[in-house]
Curated annotation (Swiss-Prot):
Keywords: Cell membrane, Membrane, Metal-binding, Molybdenum, Signal, Transport. This is Molybdate/tungstate-binding protein WtpA. Pfam families: SBP_bac_11. It is found in: Cell membrane. Tungstate binds at G46, S47, S75, D158, P159, C160, E221, Y239. InterPro entries: ABC_trnspt_W-bd_WtpA, ModA/WtpA. Residues 1-19 form the signal peptide. GO terms for biological process: molybdate ion transport. One of its GO terms (molecular function) is molybdate ion binding. Belongs to the bacterial solute-binding protein 1 family. WtpA subfamily.
């Protein structure tokens, strides 16, 4: 009897040890699998957050060995992370394609693709003052009322912010009223404007200083959504796609000033903006998104595959209010894997 108990005890101990070894082996395999997963890092414009979240889920489903990590910010800030802070990203997607050739090429990028369009609208909520009175013809008069507070993103950090300045300066030309931009921004900030033979250069200082009683400013446009919905300010200049994605009410601005139409490119270019901190001058132009794989991207193969995936599924952009450019237009040393999906310009 005693011998049987001893044998049983030994068997139980051996079994426990074996189970523990098997569990450790399984955990080790799981950890190994997790470690083998490729982390694809994407720096992208805040206005691409909704469609890129969809792309992330779709891409990961088809590529289970890839973990897509997105880091949204103002497009200028995204670029600076790479060229100034030395951070590495597998993909850079900007709300202004021109930032890639102007700031990244040739050292940090040698090609880019223009893949989607947008336009600026004036968004508001049920809490906004004069919401029942404002329309597409009197909006600029409503905004000038003393008790109305407007919001836009920082022109130093975000294309939506500097495009807002361009839109308001263009509004002066369109409505033939030289006081619009002055009353809405210049009198309430340290932004300046220089006029030369019918063209205008907006000067944005390194440190933006605004009258917070009139202007509400944050780094990128998506940072302004929650405060707008909470009633912290009344009206927000933002991309039409973002307004649609967040179910905001909005006023459509005239085509001649909303930066959304190629046929008005000559009108838009009457205005330019200089970011003094970077000594960069940006001409107003139709809003076009750009994307590239930086030259120092850690996972170029997977990054190019993601770009190819985006270009192959334009319906995601279309469904989120950002018309896709079909075929996408590409410049530079375009990867072979993308050449069948793009129109290459010299």
């Amino acid at each position: 009897m005693i011998k049987r108990l001893i044998v049983i005890s030994i068997l139980l101990i051996v079994g426990t040890v074996l189970c523990g070894c098997m569990e450790q082996e399984n955990v080790g395999q799981q950890n190994s699998e997790a470690q083998e997963k490729i982390v694809l890092k994407i720096f992208h414009a805040g206005s691409l957050s909704v469609p890129f979240e969809e792309y992330e889920k779709m891409f990961e489903k088809e590529h289970p060995n890839v973990d897509v990590e997105r880091e949204p910010a103002g497009s200028v800030a995204c670029v600076r992370k790479i060229i100034d802070l030395g951070k590495k990203a597998d993909i850079l997607a900007s709300a202004d394609y021109s930032l890639i050739p102007q700031m990244m090429m040739p050292k940090y990028a040698d090609w880019y693709v223009m893949f989607a369009r947008n336009e600026i609208v004036l968004a508001y909520t049920d809490k906004s003052k004069y919401k029942d009175e404002i329309n597409s013809t009197n909006w600029y008069k409503i905004l000038q009322r003393p008790d109305v507070k407007i919001g836009f993103s920082n022109p130093n950090d975000d294309p939506c912010g500097y495009r807002t300045q361009m839109v308001l300066q263009l509004a002066e030309l369109y409505y033939k009223d030289p006081t619009i931009y002055d009353n809405l921004v210049l009198k309430h900030s340290n932004i300046k404007v220089e006029e030369n033979n019918g063209t205008y250069l907006i000067l944005v200082p390194k440190e933006l200083d605004v009258d917070t009683n009139k202007l509400f400013v944050r780094s990128k446009e998506t940072d302004l959504l929650a405060p707008l919905e909470a009633g912290a300010f009344d009206y927000l200049f933002i991309y039409k796609s973002v307004a649609n994605q967040h179910h905001l009410k909005y006023i459509e601005l005239p085509k001649e000033i909303n930066l959304g139409y190629y046929e008005y490119a000559d009108t838009y270019k009457k205005v330019a903006l200089k970011i003094i901190a970077k000594n960069k001058t940006i001409n107003a132009k139709p809003i076009v998104y750009g994307m590239t794989v930086p030259t120092n991207a850690p996972h170029k193969k997977e990054a190019i595959e993601f770009v190819k995936f985006v270009l192959g599924h334009p319906e995601v952009l279309e469904n989120n209010g950002q018309p896709a450019i079909i075929p996408a237009v590409a410049y530079g040393n375009v990867p072979e894997e993308l050449k069948d999906l793009v129109k290459i310009e010299k």
